[in-house]
Regions:
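Short acidic-hydrophobic, aromatic-tinged amphipathic segments that line or gate anion-handling sites
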Residues: 2-9
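ATP-dependent adenylation/nucleotidyltransferase module used to activate substrates
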Residues: 81-82
Length: 312
């Protein structure tokens, strides 16, 4: 897959393409459904397939007080897009100037003149251009004027629900990780660096790695204890473990922390990059009467996870 950053200029060797455009947060199954049509059509027509996306969420530019909670920061999004088999990803720098372009000018100046889009697939509910004021019928008319075919992709439904980034975020925010996995098409993941923690887990017999997220805009699941798989650094192995998200109420904590205990692992993780894939939520976080009572519950949590993962 070739990645192009438009603010650095547009390559002169771009061929005519079949393309689609969007922010693609999560690259969920609805996105995958749309992109599969782009890739298949491009192959049938002997053209390159292209995804056009943005380096930041448009609302970050349009609303100064907006704080995004992303399913996938840019680099992870590019990794997931590469897995779809698309030929080219063009990353646009979304700024105030770009937000002022009408749909017509966006299609003419960027899609036609710079990216050589011959056929454009539009998601069933997607709009672009200044204030998102125009819709699919307008895009078709502009495309006809420019010699660009515009096609609307059908909706992708799962159990009667339109799969969208909003739906995926709602599941993650509620700790509904199995539902999130069904919508995303893969287990939700977060990554970061292991930093010094409180050492409380080690004293209880459950040493934990305290994770500092690589991107603070990342959406964090609801507080609770989760069954997870963990990858350390560049290792290919995903190890089973459990993660606590919350304020550590048994120890009087107030700030939310992300702590993961990896089963059957005794290595030193400080400074390492780790990635956590969420399988399911085991229970909510709660305050225990003593550290010993918490340790007993953690032992039960671990057994619950081992039993469930051995059966699944």
């Amino acid at each position: 897959m070739r990645t192009i950053y438009l603010q650095k200029g547009c390559p002169a060797d771009l061929a005519a393409s079949v393309a689609t455009i969007g922010f693609f947060d999560g690259v969920h199954r609805g996105h995958q459904f749309l992109i599969s049509h782009v890739v298949e059509t491009a192959r049938e027509e002997g053209r390159q397939s292209m995804i056009i996306t943005f380096d930041q969420h448009p609302r970050e530019v349009l609303h100064a007080d907006y704080q995004p909670r992303l399913l996938t920061p840019l680099q992870e999004k590019l990794y997931l897009l590469e897995r779809t088999g698309v030929d080219v990803v063009a990353v646009l720098h979304f700024d105030a100037a770009l937000s002022q372009l009408s749909a017509h000018d966006f299609m003419h100046d960027l899609l036609q003149e710079r990216l050589h889009v011959a056929k454009l697939f539009i998601g069933y509910d997607h709009r672009f251009g200044h204030n998102r004021a125009e819709g699919f019928a307008d895009y078709v008319a502009y495309g006809r004027e420019m010699g660009m075919e515009v096609v609307q992709n059908p909706v992708f439904e799962l159990e009667g629900v339109n799969v969208s980034s909003t739906v995926c975020r709602r599941h993650v925010a509620a700790g509904e990780m199995e539902a999130a996995s069904r919508c995303l098409g893969y287990p939700y993941r977060m990554g970061g660096r292991v930093v010094a923690g409180f050492q409380e887990g080690r004293k209880l017999g459950f040493p934990t790695a305290n994770i500092q997220l690589a991107d603070p805009r990342r959406l964090v699941p609801a507080s609770g204890v989760y069954a997870v798989r963990v990858k350390v650094g560049d290792e290919a192995t995903w190890r089973l473990g459990m993660m606590n998200i919350g304020t550590r109420p048994t120890f009087g904590g107030e700030k939310v922390s992300l702590e993961v205990h990896i089963f059957d692992f005794a290595g030193d993780l400080y400074g390492c990059q780790v990635e956590v894939a969420f399988l399911r939520r085991v229970r909510e976080e709660r305050k225990f009467a003593s550290p010993e009572e918490l340790a007993a519950q953690l032992a039960r949590d671990k057994q619950t996870i081992l039993d469930a993962c051995c059966l699944s």
